[in-house]
C-alpha cells in the first residue's frame, strides 16, 4: 500500500540526511528542558522591567497555556488517541538530545537516535494535538497582540519548533498543521475574554490601576 501524504511528508522531514548537526539542531528546537532556564530568566526580566504591558502579557500567556494544556490539549489527546509516528512506523527515527548536565552540553554532543517501535505503542495515543506546537503558537499569538510586529517575529521559532516535532519523530505533519491554527484561534478568544474581564472587573477591584490602564491590551 502506498504511504499516505501525511507519511510522505513525515519521511521527508524525518529522513536521515547524513548530517548529524542537523539532527542535533532539530533536537534542540524540540527540547523544552533545553530552553527552560532561558525562558525563566526572560520571564523574570519582563516581570521586573517590562512594566504593565510586560506583566499583563506574562499573565495572559501563563493563563492561556494553562487553560489550553489542562482544558483542551490533554483532554483532546485522550479523546482522539492518535499514535505517534514512532509507535506506528518502525522506519521512523526518534531523535533526542543526549542526557547531559549542564543541559547546554547536549547541543555540542551527537544526538541519541533510535528506531521506532510499534510494539511499545501505549493504549492511548498522544500525537494530536501537539502540545509543543500549540504552546509555541499560543506564545507567538500573545506576543503579537501585545507587541505587534516585534512579537510576530516569534512565529519564526514557533514554526521551527513545530517542524522539529516532525523531524525528531514525535508528531505527524497533520498534527502540527491542525495544532498551530487551532492554538491561534483559541488564544485570540482567550485574549478577548481577558480584555473583557479587565474592563469589567478592574474598575472595582483595582480602581487606581484601571484608571491608568483602562485597557488590558493597549495599542502599541
List each language-model region with its residue ranges:
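Hydrophobic, aromatic-rich transmembrane alpha-helices
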Residues: 39-49, 136-144
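Hydrophobic, aromatic-rich alpha-helical transmembrane segments
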Residues: 21-24, 54-59, 169-173, 177
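Interfacial segments of alpha-helical transmembrane regions
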Residues: 43-77
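Membrane-embedded catalytic cores of phosphoryl/pyrophosphoryl-handling enzymes
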Residues: 102-220
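N-terminal transmembrane-helix/juxtamembrane module of multi-pass inner/ER membrane proteins
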Residues: 1-41, 72-122, 210, 214-220
